[in-house]
């Protein structure tokens, strides 16, 4: 399973990219809005220079014509740009048109398996089920991932399943076990995933033993 970073913060991207684990980046209007004074195009292009993989940039139009217009513009910014559109009927129209142009789309805000099936049939490159938000309404978000993966495999659908709205490191594990192709994570979750008290204790013990051995020679 690939790991993407869910952020528009360039410092976070630079740091995570230095770990050698990133295969892509996802952004959205809310994440962009956190970066005060940032230019959308320049930010996406800078991200593409830092991470060699799909970079999702989201259209803000609600109608298919607007999404297509934005998507075609985004696609000129960098070959790795993937256009994000919502799981709506207008989004499906946009995906089918953009796909015919050879422009890859990430269909976002997916909350049921039928939306995922429709997106795939329209030509989506990626489908993004929001597991954390599904959990929030009392339903198991990972069951949605499992349903989509099962449907796609049964019907030889090549659309990639991206687990979004990741809230904690366990979500990453569960997404991998459920068969997701990608998990996109906030920076703090990636950091948390590499922290464990036993790792810290082990390092301290190894260093203490090494120091004692060196002093006793």
From Swiss-Prot:
Any GO BP: carbohydrate metabolic process
Pathway: Carbohydrate degradation; pentose phosphate pathway; D-glyceraldehyde 3-phosphate and beta-D-fructose 6-phosphate from D-ribose 5-phosphate and D-xylulose 5-phosphate (non-oxidative stage): step 2/3
Protein localization: Cytoplasm
Top-rank taxon, per record: Bacteria
Keywords associated with the record: Cytoplasm, Pentose shunt, Schiff base, Transferase
Gene3D superfamilies given in the database record: Aldolase class I
Similarity comment: family membership: Belongs to the transaldolase family. Type 3B subfamily.
Name this polypeptide is given: Probable transaldolase
Organism this protein belongs to: Roseiflexus castenholzii (strain DSM 13941 / HLO8)
Lineage: Bacteria, Bacillati, Chloroflexota, Chloroflexia, Chloroflexales
């Amino acid at each position: 399973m690939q790991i993407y970073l869910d952020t528009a913060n360039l410092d976070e991207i630079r740091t995570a990219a230095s770990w050698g684990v990133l295969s892509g980046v996802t952004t959205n209007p809310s994440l962009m809005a956190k970066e005060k004074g940032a230019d959308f195009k320049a930010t996406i292009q800078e991200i593409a220079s830092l991470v060699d993989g799909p970079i999702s940039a989201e259209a803000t139009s609600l109608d298919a014509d607007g999404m297509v217009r934005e998507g075609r513009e985004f696609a000129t910014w960098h070959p790795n740009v993937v256009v994000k559109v919502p799981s709506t009927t207008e989004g499906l129209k946009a995906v089918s048109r953009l796909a015919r142009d050879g422009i890859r789309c990430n269909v976002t805000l997916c909350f049921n398996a039928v939306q995922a099936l429709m997106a795939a049939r329209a030509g989506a490159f990626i489908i993004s089920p929001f597991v954390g938000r599904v959990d929030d309404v009392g339903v198991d978000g990972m069951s949605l991932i499992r349903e989509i993966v099962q449907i796609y495999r049964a019907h030889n659908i090549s659309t990639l399943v991206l687990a979004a709205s990741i809230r904690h490191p366990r979500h990453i594990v569960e997404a991998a076990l459920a068969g997701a192709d990608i998990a996109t994570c906030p920076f703090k979750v990636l950091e948390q995933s590499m922290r464990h008290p036993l790792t810290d204790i082990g390092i301290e013990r190894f260093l203490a033993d090494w120091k004692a051995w060196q002093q006793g020679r």
